[in-house]
Amino acid sequence: MLKKIKLMRDSVEDWKAYPFSIPAISSLEELVLRSRICFFAGENGTGKSTLLEAIAVHYGFGREGGTRSFMNDSTDSNRSVDPLVCALRLSFDKRTGAGYFLRAESFFNTVSYMDELDKEEAPHSTPISAFYGGRSLHTRSHCETFFKPLELKFQRNGLFLLDEPEAALSPQKQLAFLVLIHDVLKKYKDAQFIISTHSPVLLGYPKAQIVSFDDGPLHEIEYEETAPMQIVRRFVNERETFLEELFDDPPSLFKDDF
């Protein structure tokens, strides 16, 4: 199990260059993982996906996702994390070498890459699709394309890294995902999840460690302190008042996004 993520600060050549220009990354010294499920929470651009990708590459996953034996580095989209990869030290009490890395933004590229490889393979070789339910994931619905690998690849010990998996999961499927995580953690004592997410549903997993990337240095927070939970709670409990205030005076954060 991954226990510590440490930034070897002497290895950083330029603190002004990306990704060290991100406050949460530049302030990182040592992050101790005390739970088998840890969530990275924070607004877009705060570094949660950047750190997750760096951990994945350091561990040996392909940059676009998949298992360690499936190295899809077909694009250069995230090579910018390399300086962080080189400066990280990961400490394990037990390292299985197994696991899965899912990047929501590039997963469909990965599926296309798998289909291309299947077309190129020798006639008697086992197609990659055989390990994903027997047919191309592109033949499934958008939600199934994401969920089927989770169902199939999580049935083992290992390190499972997921970057915003809620992007393709309905609220009902997010609940099903929580059940899947619960079953895996119960069945496999050396299974571990690190998940970058905005989902108030996923963040609500019992006794999970939540690390916030907002407001500077990394720090742990409780579920009730997460922005997604607070926003949804107020929206549900005070919808009309909340929307009136929002429309009358949109926060500067939203204006910047537009």
Language-model features, listed with the residues they occupy:
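N-terminal pre-Walker A segment at the start of P-loop NTPase domains
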Residues: 1-29, 34
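Phosphate-binding glycine-rich loops of NTP-binding sites
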Residues: 35-69, 196
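Catalytic phosphate/metal-binding cores of nucleic-acid and nucleotide-processing enzymes, i.e., regions
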Residues: 39-43, 55, 66, 74, ...
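Flexible phosphate/Mg2+-sensing switch loops adjacent to catalytic phosphate-binding sites
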Residues: 61-91
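Nucleotide-state sensing region of NTPase/ATPase domains
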Residues: 79-116
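Conserved P-loop NTPase mechanochemical-coupling segment
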Residues: 111-140
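GG-anchored amphipathic helix commonly corresponding to the ABC/SMC/Rad50 NBD signature/C-loop
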Residues: 132, 140-164, 171-187
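C-terminal lobe/lid and adjacent interdomain/linker elements of RecA-like ASCE P-loop ATPase modules
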Residues: 172-258
